Amino acid sequence: CIELNLLGGCYGYSVVHGGKKFCYLCYNEYETSQLDALLKFADEADLVIWDGMFTEAELETKRGWGHSSIEQGIFFSENCGHARVLISHHAPARLDNELHEIQKKLPDRVSLARDGLTLRL
């Protein structure tokens, strides 16, 4: 596991099974000082679940809430090798049509989690 940035504490974890690696990095208020440690933790991951509750613009007024942005998840995906990044933990007030518009703008290796999503690693 890896310690994440959340008031009160939180940990990210990874699971390796059948030669595949999955990392869960939610409830983390991402800071650039974490990048090297998170990249090392997610090294050789096939899938990373990323906390993307906010957009970068929304995050400006949500500092201290313990969540990251969609754009930070994209940045992480650009730096973490071949892993697919799944943005999760969406803002509760975000509407499905807003998520659909966000999804259309994401790079190929990044997508949004949704209810009922099943993935095969």
What are these regions (language model features)?
Residues 17-22, 121:
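Beta-strand-turn-beta hairpins that frame and shape the catalytic cleft
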Residues 7-9:
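Short acidic/glycine-enriched loop/turn segments that link adjacent beta-strands
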